[in-house]
Amino acid sequence: DVPHIIQVIGRSNQFGLLGLFHDDQNPVNVDTTQNLTGLAIKRQDAIELLNQVPRWHRNLLGALGMRLHQAFTPKRIGHRPRLVAILHASEEYRHLSTTLIRRLQSLGEDVAVISDREDTRVTAKRSISLLDKHGNLRNPNEVRSEASSWATIERCVLDIQLDKNIEYLNEVLQDSDTILCCFDSNTSQETESLLFELSECHPAARKKISLVRILRGTQQVADPLKNMHSICRGDFKIHWDGFGQSCHTTRKSGIERIIRNLRGSSIGFALGGGAARGMAHLGVLSVLDEEGIPIDFLSGTSAGALTGIPYAAGYDSTWLIETFSQDLKPSKRYKFLPYGDAWYMIGKFRGGGWDDMLRTHLFDWTLEQLSIPFTSVTADLVAAEQVHRSGGDAASAILESINLPGVSPPICQNGRVLVDGGILNNVPADVLVTQGATFIVAVDVAAKIGHMFAGNDPTTPTDQMNTPNMFQTLGRVRAAQDRNIRKMGTQDTDFTIEPDVSAFQLTDFQNASAIAQQGVIATREALPQLRKLLKQLDPELFPYA
């Protein structure tokens, strides 16, 4: 038999837990991608330890709960729509359909096409025209009857201009599994009006429509929309130059995001909190860019939101490293103070410095305008629960998520008292499931914590121990909290990247470059295994060696 991967585990994880409930011994091969120390415990010894060591008992029950959650949670298999309708608000970028169809064909798909074009720019082995020989629209039932012979075709694309009367569009779109509506800023108003009219005639269309917004030239983010998101389930952005190419290297996979969505293989990355240690996320993202590892969805808590939202807005990770290093560098007056970098951070929170800094780069952009969908996590002290934000002001989403309790006053608005989301969900991988990700990678900068604190280690005699000051204590409390609470949001994670940033302080923003380098190192080490898992997800989309 050909061996296959049963499970991929990381630091502090276990396997074989369910073997406690039966005597049968099932052999399994274990391969490691790095040097590690493993502990093997026989079944009888494990049972005896349950009665002898309370901490072992608690940890085992916690691990069992997570294992049962995974066992009873259905595997995330993305939906592959068979009939895909592509609506165009302008003839100018009809070539987008050709690009998508040819890409699907390059992946081995047999694609049939129904189109209202008079030319033959859309090529497929099987095609039907919506126009008769006089150039008039054919009866939809007639077209449907002709297409009935395509029962074995795995993908059918309906390519049509959005200038038809609403009754005709409603009729031809009824059988569609998903609807991609392509438009730019010049056609957004008429597109919005038509989509609302279509959704009134065909209410089920609200669950099928995804926006495809065309961004031109140097346009970094999409224009704001008023109400269109209420009638759609997805929102793609493509930087388009008219020839199927993207204009910005950091967002060049706009078309590929649509392809992955159609194939049910969307990739999500969850960026965890960790204050300055979160600068490691930028190193991770830089390697993903260089190696062509796709990102379809992003979520982030605290530092994950601070780094992830600007990246989702199209800023290059290398530029962000330099910008954070400069923008968060303490001024000279703090250099002569004990723990001056900590006092600088407190002043930045209490003096409103974060808002000014963020809006210099994010302006008044909203999360809906960003190239990559982003969900930030904050905590509401009124309801004592998480708040997930996928829309609204981008800078405010960061401010809410990084708002450290005790350092900065809570943000009070709309019946909520908002503080740093890390107190409830420090690595929000679970958020990505509801966003539609079928493969989820967590980036955890709090996983590794050194056993040295304020000059003390586990072997330091009592009479030689140092008493930590307030800043050291607050920082260590947060690091310990982040490390232990991280598992709450990572139960749905398929893979984890853990940069070792334990040598850096939580206020070490001026060392962003060195911290980011740890993200680079961890991601380079993780790449072979990550590629292997992506290939298992979709061998055609991810043909990695």
Predicted regions span which residues?
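A small-molecule sensor/coupling module
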Residues: 25-27, 44-79
